[in-house]
A protein has these predicted regions:
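C-terminal regions of proteins
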Residues: 77-167
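Second-shell loop/turn segments in exported
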Residues: 35-42, 72-77, 117-122
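Short amphipathic alpha-helical segments, especially helix-boundary/capping motifs
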Residues: 25-29, 61-64, 108-112
Length: 167
């Protein structure tokens, strides 16, 4: 099956759980963004993460954790910084590499809220293709990570402000 059209999916099913969304909406599909609360992470989830880390280390499998980008506006107005800090600490504690792709510079991955289907970060197909290329280059160590990512959310917020508010 090459593609299946699913009503309300925003585009055809391409494969492996990927809908190639190309539908431009008048506005983002609203989402119920939940406040970040690290106390809401269950012991069961942490136990599963620890078992995954142990399995990968025992079997010489490189485990890399990532947070994929969400809309620029939501990433600076929501809880991304708190979540990113939590996952950074968690991954450092277990010796696992972690990348917060919300912090990709706007030069590395130009994006606006219009490149997304909803506030949760479901990308339209064109952005998903560009992000996949960048993700691969980071994982394959084929890019300069020191210039591909902002160092802080304050730098991201400044770039979002410069790109959206002042233009």
């Amino acid at each position: 099956m090459d593609a299946v059209e699913i009503h309300d999916a925003g585009g055809p099913y391409a494969a492996k759980g990927f809908f190639y969304r190309d539908m431009k909406m008048d506005s983002l599909v609203p989402s119920d963004i939940v406040a970040w609360d690290e106390s809401g992470i269950s012991d069961k989830v942490l136990d599963s993460f620890e078992k995954t880390v142990q399995y990968c280390k025992k079997n010489n499998i490189e485990l890399v954790c990532v947070t994929s980008p969400i809309t620029p506006t939501t990433s600076v107005n929501g809880y991304s910084e708190q979540a990113g800090a939590y996952f950074t600490r968690l991954c450092e504690e277990y010796g696992v590499e972690y990348y917060d792709f919300n912090l990709l510079t706007m030069d590395t991955l130009p994006r606006t809220d219009d490149d997304f289907f909803d506030e949760e970060g479901h990308m339209l197909g064109e952005l998903a293709d560009r992000y996949s290329d960048i993700l691969a280059s980071v994982l394959l160590d084929k890019c300069d990570k020191s210039t591909a990512f902002y160092g802080t959310y304050a730098q991201l917020e400044q770039a979002v402000y410069e790109n959206y508010v002042t233009k």
